[in-house]
Amino acid sequence: MRTALRTSLAAFSAAAIALTVSALPRSAGAQTLNDPTIVAIFDAANTWDMETGALAVKRAKTHDVHEFAEMLVRDHKAVRQQGRDLAKKLGVTPTPPANFGMAKDHAAAMAKLSKLTGAAFDKAFLAHEVAYHKAVLDAVTTTLLPALQNVEVKDLVTKVGPAFQAHMIKAQSLLDSYPTK
């Protein structure tokens, strides 16, 4: 049951992000995927991982998961601020996409994680982080970077890619080595 919940939460998180982001430019009548929209998505992605990280700081059972969660909050806070500073410098007003379904998806993931405690929480959180970072990296590579027009915004998104990759790898490593008892 716990493995099924962890797997379904991770799959839900990844699918929600991938579907919402990949559908943006193709939907009939959808808002154009432009720099202000991408800046809003970038900001939201960092904010949401800060929120899941903050939940894990409070609920993590193991020291390693707690430290990982603190790192997520710290790293994503810094990256979010870099994005906000750049948007301000460029005079870009972040404009979330119409029907920003990812916000509802994040709320649902947080609600599911909030119901868990102990090892079940740790494992579900780590699985979520693997899926979340993979989905964000896939969306950045296939949808967001190709649509970005501003070189400075593109450079920032490209620059933080390795940190997102490192978070995904660390979460997977912690999940793979999580004590079975």
Feature locations, PLM:
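His/Met- and acidic-residue-enriched segments that coordinate or traffic transition-metal cofactors
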Residues: 3-10, 19-181
